[in-house]
Amino acid sequence: MANPRNEAALAELKARFAETDTVVLTEYRGLTVAQTTELRKALGFDVQYSVAKNTLVKIAANEAGIEGLDDLLTGPTAVAFIKGEAVDTAKVLKKFGEENKAFVVKGGYMDGNALTAEQVNAIAELDNRETTLAKLAGAMKGSLAKAAGLFNAPASQVARLAVALQDKKDA
C-alpha cells in the first residue's frame, strides 16, 4: 500500500474509528449524487457519511480493535461514523432506506459488538435518550405523588378518627 492517497485515506479512517461511538455500514449502489447529498444533510453534523475502499475500512477497523465487520465489507460500501445519538441516526437511515430501495443497511458496530442489519433497524425503533429520560421522569413523578398520598393517608385517617371520637363524646 505505497500509494500516498491510500495512506492518507487509511489515516483518516483510523482517526474516524477512534473518535466514533457507533458505525453503520450501508450499500449505496444505485443512489444518485443528489440522493447521497440528501442523506448526508438528513444525518446532520454528528455523523460523517463517506465512501471508502473496503480493504482500507477493514484495516482501519481492525487496527482500532473493531471486529466483526469483515463479512459486511463486500460490494460498494459507505460508512456512517456516528459521534452522537445512534438511535436518531438509525431512524434516519431506516427512513431513507424505505424511501430509496437502492439503499441498504448492511450492519454496524456499537458498544463493542458487531450489529446485523436487523439489529440496526431494531435500534431505529427505540426511543432516543431524551424521550426515554422524559418517560422515566414522568413515571417517577407519578410514583412519588402516589407515595406522598400513601404517607398522608394515615395522618388524615387519624384526624378523622379524632373528630369522630370528639363527636361521640359530645353526643
From Swiss-Prot:
Keyword Mitochondrion attached: no
MF terms in GO: large ribosomal subunit rRNA binding
Cellular component terms per the entry's GO annotation: ribonucleoprotein complex; ribosome
GO biological process: translation
InterPro entries: Ribosomal_uL10, Ribosomal_uL10-like_sf, Ribosomal_uL10_bac, Ribosomal_uL10_bac_type
Keywords associated with the record: Ribonucleoprotein, Ribosomal protein, RNA-binding, rRNA-binding
Family: Belongs to the universal ribosomal protein uL10 family.
Quaternary structure (record): Part of the ribosomal stalk of the 50S ribosomal subunit. The N-terminus interacts with L11 and the large rRNA to form the base of the stalk. The C-terminus forms an elongated spine to which L12 dimers bind in a sequential fashion forming a multimeric L10(L12)X complex.
General function of this protein: Forms part of the ribosomal stalk, playing a central role in the interaction of the ribosome with GTP-bound translation factors.
Identification of the protein by name: Large ribosomal subunit protein uL10
Lineage: Bacteria, Bacillati, Actinomycetota, Actinomycetes, Mycobacteriales
